Design a protein with these regions (language model features):
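Conserved class I S-adenosyl-L-methionine
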Residues: 1-43
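Class I SAM-dependent methyltransferase SAM/SAH-binding core
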Residues: 49, 55-100
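A short acidic, Gly/Pro-enriched loop at the edge of an enzyme's catalytic core
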Residues: 101-110
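A short beta-strand submotif of the Rossmann-like class I SAM-dependent methyltransferase core
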Residues: 113-114, 122
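A short, conserved alpha-helix within the catalytic core of class I
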Residues: 120-129
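Conserved catalytic/acceptor-binding region of the Class I
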Residues: 130, 134-200
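C-terminal helical/coil "lid" or tail adjacent to the Rossmann-like core of SAM-dependent
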Residues: 191-231
Length: 231
């Protein structure tokens, strides 16, 4: 994958990070999932499409709430691990760019995009999501990030990533106001904007794994030799 506005156009492939992604990026605490359920989404008798599902973190962890899930990802290796980790669940996974997906009208109650919306071609995808959603359906855009200016460990970790990959643009996140997106048009209205803090605990090993599985390190951004130096 290559995006001009991400990492200055440097190519990356999440499938190359799948081993570490599967092991170290299933980090959302129960509070995160309970917040989604509390808002009335992804629950029993709903059909949900998870875009850029990765290793199926969202469908796997929310399966217990009773929704019927489909997860899609562009990276075949991500879907390979999603299927392995979902072997006890009735979750359907598809390998495809999200922009190439085709579903019938009114197919889903909810469409989710977690940690991924910036990668999509919105001109293609947004009309499709509008078509796929049932009347009164919902499109959830979710994002969780560390705050380097509030955590010395996060700040130093970003410095180390940038030492070996100065083109990485995933740095420097701060708290910000959730603005109404300009792509809404007459297709969507905003029903909820929510921001909250969550404490996520890491060991030395799990934090190392989480950073290695970020776009700046493990997605083909660095060679094996460069990764060894970073480690």
């Amino acid at each position: 994958m290559k995006k001009d506005n991400i990492d200055f156009g440097k190519e990356f492939d999440w499938g190359k990070a799948s081993i570490d992604y599967a092991k170290y990026r299933d980090i959302y605490p129960d509070e995160f999932y309970n917040k989604i359920i509390g808002l009335g989404y992804c629950k029993e008798n709903q059909k949900v499409l998870d875009l850029a599902t990765g290793t199926g973190v969202l469908p796997r962890n929310m399966y217990k709430f009773g929704a019927k899930w489909i997860g899609v990802d562009i990276a075949e290796n991500q879907i390979k691990y999603a299927k392995l980790l979902s072997k006890d669940f009735d979750i359907n996974y598809i390998v495809s760019p999200v922009e190439n997906l085709e579903f019938e009208e009114n197919s889903f109650d909810v469409v989710t995009a977690c940690q991924c919306f910036m990668y999509f071609d919105k001109n293609i995808l947004i009309p499709k999501i509008h078509k796929w959603l049932k009347p009164n359906g919902h499109f959830l855009i979710m994002f969780m990030d560390w705050l380097p200016y509030e955590s010395e460990i996060a700040y130093k970790s970003e410095e180390l990533v940038l030492k070996y990959n100065p083109l990485w643009s995933g740095k420097g996140s701060t708290r910000y106001e959730i603005k109404t997106p300009d792509w809404l048009g007459n297709m969507f209205t905003v029903s909820n904007k929510t921001a909250f803090d969550i404490d996520v605990n890491f060991t030395r090993d799990t934090w190392h794994g989480r950073i290695k599985a970020c776009r700046g390190i493990g997605t083909g951004a660095l060679s094996e030799k460069e990764i060894s130096k970073w480690e």
